[in-house]
Curated annotation (Swiss-Prot):
First-level EC class: hydrolase
Keywords on record: Hydrolase, Metal-binding, Metalloprotease, Mitochondrion, Protease, Transit peptide, Zinc
Gene label: OCT1
CDD domains reported in the protein's UniProt record: M3A_MIP (cd06457)
Protein name (Swiss-Prot/TrEMBL): Mitochondrial intermediate peptidase
Ranges of Basic and acidic residues composition bias in the record: 83-94
Organism phylogeny: Eukaryota, Fungi, Dikarya, Basidiomycota, Ustilaginomycotina
Species name: Mycosarcoma maydis
Length: 889
């Protein structure tokens, strides 16, 4: 018998449950004024894969895969292939497949003094980060005062009208000013290997976020914004994009409770703070870390008093477990005496997840399932207090539920529309889920034909009497057996054909074919990137054949943005994948910086001169470069994004490149969907640039990329054997995709259940004194039963809801991923299924969807892209229609 230390137990718990935690940064702007900090639009890999498998008990570990189309004998056709482009693609492949091992070997790393992080001259040392934040705040105060004073401007004078017309642009400038530092600090505090830099970035982040929280309750800014939208002479001069920006700010103000009377506004702030603390504790519990609030102290005292998390397993239930697995399980037991093993449900979840997969005795799996879904009374109480606090917050704003409050600026608009969508989607996918379930029931039948009768019990839910009833604790084991079956386990590996460099070069070829956009490796200046080891961070220019900055790319193309690729795992770096937006597109030549100093004042009322803040023309302390554009008038700052992954770094040339698994290729394509959205969505206003759009729309471009990667025509562009150069055989891809999607219907059905649970938890139910999150889960689980499975993911005594981390980060919007999966399937079939490399189809999607960022109603975008006017209104009928489309599996 061996007992692991408390820290080791917690570490194991953290690993086992890490995919439950909402690690992803929000996919769009934060729901408060000016807080649309462009934290990574896509969520780390969790938001793609875990949204399908949020529980370890999910029906399958299969990956999303789409219909395979056999390529024509002619192979894919590239639009105007150019030899220079292929040279650049070859350089990309070489750069990522064999990154330099020393600075002297890196021809893309220049020498000389530091140019500053992201080539910001002032950021040459961590000490300067807070100084930059302070300069930014001082500059922001001038803008705030100027906007506030515009509210008292005389609208009957030319100057008064001029100032009022500048309000939306000035608010957007203010947002860009603050987010430019906050977004960068968010990246640096997470990714920089030097603790000094990380701490300095965190200090700057918290400093400016604190100021932003003050702005969220600035009644002067709210009043002047509301006022200009009611002045016809001003409102009529706003472009559609500017109007969209104004509406975003207005909604975010009101979601912050700014329109409430003082006493109610104070309560709003109190509740918001409480929700934040509760949410952090909720996620810390899931991660296996110790929360520090009152609920954590109650839970600790309860566990010490009654040992409620202790689980006993008779050893004779484990006799048929693989000896190697059993040895590891027994070694982890807290006690092993008299034929009984004891474990901690709170600290050793990996034990129970292992037994759910590999314990043939159903009694052991049933105990393991309940333990894997263990939730202390205090954890349940914390979640329910979180949901009730949200319900009270919504009531303060005049909404009937938190979902109603949160969905006003989403595609769904209101909870009833989400329910229409999910109801239609449930009906569409139920037959497919039942079909997949029967595959697992047959495996159970084959395994239990000689077992005692209690293992093959029947019920009124079992419409196929020849197959045994399926319990929640059966899922993991028979899913594991399903994928180990002869027909699926013999699938040929794809990794030898999928080196990081080949995939990156293939992405460049794909975007060139579709959008006339490609990648080119670029020189990295000293001090420009956060991890300066040779080859740690690569810089990639994004070029457009007909648009972009004049005369910057050294070719006939124009520069439209920059991607920094931080792909290799290193100590201290966050796991998973993420897309960070460091800088957004914005038109700058119309900025009236001089007017800030004329009309604005410091917070203490002082007149401020440009030289007081660093010199003449000090508009933005970041001093971001700006460029004239070939396709439109004006000067723009260009988007800068960071693509972060944790792939294994290649060794020396003899060891070969980093070879990716299929799910890692999907991850790269998914995150690149966000990146290309940022590159193409170069709007005139920061606040609607790129991925700054509705939460339930932002995943469309990235999910669509998953369709591309499973197309043979596209795979032909990127899959080459790393040593022979041979193309990936079609039959290898076909068999892999068939295997990976073989239980997709069941996975999707379970995700629908979680989306419906999220809606119930954020409905009026949460405000009821008798509300029980466990009862609500149990009732929904029974309601959504499948033939032969009276319960999908619940059994008495379990509390699976306390493992559903997305309840905090995506409260009432968990349906978003499902909605965008449906839309992506429809767009794929409408535009790309017949020819994934068609330039005309690519231009339609580029010009009717991607280029608008968040500046156009997503329903109008969808109607235009699909030629489906029936969904243009985005009402309940539109949501119901989208639900009926279903997700192609």
């Amino acid at each position: 018998m061996a007992s692991t230390s408390k820290n080791a137990q917690r570490a194991a718990a953290s690993v086992a449950h890490s995919y439950h935690v909402c690690l992803a940064r929000r996919m769009s702007r934060l729901p408060t004024l000016l807080s649309n900090i462009s934290a990574p639009a896509a969520s780390k890999a969790l938001d793609r894969y875990e949204s399908k498998r949020i529980h370890s008990r999910s029906f399958s570990s299969s990956l999303a895969a789409q219909r395979v189309q056999r390529p024509t004998s002619a192979g894919p056709i590239l639009t105007n292939p150019i030899s220079d482009h292929e040279k650049d693609n070859d350089e990309l492949r070489s750069l990522f497949d064999a990154p330099p091992t020393s600075s002297s070997a890196n021809h893309l790393r220049s020498s000389g003094p530091s140019t500053g992080l992201f080539e910001i001259p002032s950021l040459t040392s961590p000490q300067n980060f807070l100084v930059l934040a302070q300069q930014t705040l001082a500059r922001a105060q001038l803008l705030v005062d100027r906007i506030d004073r515009a509210g008292s401007a005389d609208a009957s004078t030319a100057q008064g009208i001029k100032e009022l017309k500048e309000v939306v642009r000035n608010l957007d400038r203010l947002s860009d000013l603050l987010c430019g530092v906050i977004d960068m600090a968010e990246l640096v505090r997470n990714a920089h290997p030097d603790p000094e830099w990380a701490e300095a970035a965190n200090a700057a982040y918290e400093y400016l976020c604190g100021y932003m929280n003050v702005l969220n309750t600035h009644t002067g800014l709210y009043s002047v914004l509301k006022n200009i939208l009611s002045i016809k002479e001003v409102a009529e001069t706003l472009s559609k994009e500017a109007t969209a920006v104004a509406q975003v700010f207005l909604r975010d103000f009101e979601k912050s409770g700014i329109h409430l009377p003082p006493a109610e506004r104070e309560r709003f702030v109190q509740l918001s703070d409480e929700i934040l603390v509760l949410g952090r504790g909720f996620l810390q519990d899931i991660a296996g870390n110790d929360a520090s609030d009152d609920f954590a102290r109650i839970a600790s005292a309860q566990a010490d008093a009654d040992k409620s998390d202790m689980v006993g397993l008779p050893t004779h239930w484990l006799e048929d477990v693989n000896p190697t697995i059993l040895k590891a399980v027994r070694a982890s037991a807290i006690t092993d005496t008299d034929g009984l093993l004891t474990f901690s449900a709170a600290d050793q979840p990996w034990v129970f997840q292992t037994l759910l997969k590999y314990a043939p005795d159903e009694r052991a799996r049933k105990v393991a399932f309940r333990a894997a879904n263990y939730g202390s009374q205090a954890q349940v109480q914390r979640l329910e207090r979180l949901l009730k606090a949200r319900a009270e917050l919504a009531t303060l704003t005049g909404a009937s539920s938190y979902a109603e409050m949160a969905l006003g600026d989403k595609m769904a608009k209101e909870p009833q529309n989400v329910e229409e969508f999910l109801r239609a989607l449930t009906k569409h996918h139920r037959p497919r889920a039942s079909h997949d379930l029967d595959k697992l029931r047959r495996l159970k039948h084959n395994a239990t034909v000689s077992e005692p009768a209690q293992n093959t019990r029947q019920s009124t839910f079992n419409t196929n009497s020849t197959l045994p009833e399926f319990a929640p604790w059966d899922r993991d084991m028979y899913t594991e057996q399903h994928f180990r079956s002869a027909s699926l386990s013999n699938v040929q590996p794809l990794s030898p054909y999928l080196s990081v460099g080949s995939v990156f070069a293939g992405l460049s070829r794909l975007f060139s074919a579709l959008y006339g956009i490609r990648f080119r490796a670029s020189m990295v200046a000293p001090g420009e990137v956060w991890s300066e080891g040779a080859g740690d961070v690569m810089k990639v220019e994004v070029l457009d054949e007909s648009e972009g900055a004049r005369g910057t790319s050294g070719s006939a193309e124009g520069l439209i943005g920059t991607i920094y690729a931080d792909l290799w795992s290193r100590e201290g770096k966050p796991g998973g994948a993420a897309h960070y937006t460091v800088r957004c597109s914005r038109r700058v030549d119309k900025d009236d910086e001089a007017g800030d100093f004329t009309y604005g004042r410091a917070e203490d009322g002082r007149v401020v001169r440009p030289q007081d803040l660093g010199g003449e023309g000090c508009g933005n302390p970041l001093q971001a470069p700006t460029f004239e554009q070939r396709e439109r008038p004006g000067r723009y700052q260009l988007p800068v994004v960071v693509l972060m992954c944790d792939f294994a770094r290649p060794g020396n040339a003899n060891q070969g490149p980093c070879l990716l698994g299929w799910h890692e290729v999907e991850t790269l394509f998914h995150e690149m969907g966000h990146a290309i959205h940022s590159m193409i969505g170069r709007t005139s206003y920061h606040n609607v640039s790129g991925t700054r759009c509705a939460t339930d729309f932002v995943e469309l471009p990235s999910i669509l990329m998953e369709h591309f990667v499973s197309s043979p025509q596209v795979v032909h562009l990127l899959a080459r054997h790393h040593s022979t150069g041979a193309s990936l055989p079609f039959e290898h891809l076909s068999s892999h995709l068939a295997a990976s999607k073989s239980l997709e219907g069941l996975d999707t059905y379970h995700q629908i259940l979680l989306a419906r649970l999220d809606q119930l938890y954020h409905s009026q139910l949460a405000a009821s004194p008798s509300f029980s999150s466990t009862t609500t889960y149990s009732d929904l689980d029974r309601q959504m039963h499948l033939p032969g499975a009276p319960n999908l993911s619940y059994t008495e005594g379990a509390h699976p809801q306390v493992r559903f981390g997305h309840l905090f980060g995506y409260g009432s919007t968990y349906y978003s991923y499902l909605l965008d999966r449906v839309i992506a399937s429809k767009v794929w079939n409408h535009l790309f299924a017949n020819n994934p490399l068609d330039r005309y189809a690519g231009q339609v999607f580029k010009n009717q969807c991607l280029k608008y960022g968040g500046g156009k109603d997503p329903w109008h975008i969808l109607a235009d892209v699909l030629n489906e006017d029936s969904v243009r209104q985005g009402d309940s009928r539109a949501m119901q229609q989208v639900g009926k489309w279903g997700i192609e599996c």
